[in-house]
Regions:
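Ser/Thr-glycine-rich phosphate-binding loops at phosphate-binding pockets of nucleotides
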Residues: 1, 66, 90-91, 178-180
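Conserved AMP-binding/adenylate-forming
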Residues: 1-78, 84-86, 102
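Short, charged/polar, Gly/Pro-enriched secondary-structure boundary elements
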Residues: 7-8, 131-136, 176-178
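Short aromatic/basic micro-patch
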Residues: 37-38, 48, 95, 169, ...
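AMP-binding/adenylate-forming catalytic core of the ANL superfamily
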Residues: 40, 45-46, 55, 69-161
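Conserved C-terminal "lid"/linker of ANL adenylate-forming enzymes
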Residues: 113, 121, 152-189
Length: 189
């Protein structure tokens, strides 16, 4: 939620300080991503008949763990970079947010959807090709390999050095999804 005309690129909007408080579990929330915690009148108070889940979801002082990772700038603009459960750790200790890489890859030619996973301490892109675009272009398997090689090279010029993707695997079927449409990441680890 924000004010009309005051949006910042890659933000989810400005934090409006009514009925809810937000903070990030980070020593430097303006520069280092942390988990978004929320508290207030509009935040639910717990899981129905599930004390254990409620205790795990809240801090001792009542802040709800959203599972979202992000930052907030000095103007109270929120930037979400991923989910706690999907964050990967590089071999040199850098936090890697696969969703950021996937957004770039998903906008490349002939990519319908992608998923970044870690295998043997290297990042691997699982790619579902856009079958309709391939058919329209009359592209065969050999050309698909050339296209995806070019996509990988272009991707690795964009991402930070610690987020370089070492290889890709073509997936012939769309990824399994949750009812809300999120990829079931745990199935591809």
């Amino acid at each position: 939620v924000g004010h009309l005309g005051s949006y910042k690129l890659k933000s989810v909007g400005e934090y409006v300080q009514e009925h809810v408080s937000v903070r990030f579990d980070s020593k430097d929330p303006e520069h280092v991503a942390g988990e978004l915690l929320v508290k207030g009148d509009v935040v639910f108070s717990g899981y129905y008949k599930n004390e254990e889940a409620t205790k795990a979801a809240f801090t001792e002082d009542g802040w709800f763990h959203t599972g979202d990772l992000g930052t907030m700038d000095k103007d109270n603009t929120l930037f979400l970079v991923g989910r706690c459960k999907s964050m990967l750790l590089s071999s040199n200790g850098q936090n890697i947010y696969p969703e950021e890489i996937e957004v770039v890859l998903n906008n490349m030619p002939f990519v319908a959807e992608s998923l970044i996973v870690s295998r043997k301490e290297k990042l691997v892109a699982l790619i579902v090709p856009d079958q309709n675009a391939l058919a329209d272009a009359g592209t065969d398997a050999e050309n698909l390999t050339k296209i995806m090689d070019a996509n990988l090279a272009a991707l690795n010029k964009i991402v930070p050095a610690y987020s370089v993707v070492s290889s890709y695997e073509i997936q012939l079927e769309p990824f399994a999804k949750t009812p809300k449409g999120s990829i079931k990441r745990f199935m591809y680890v």
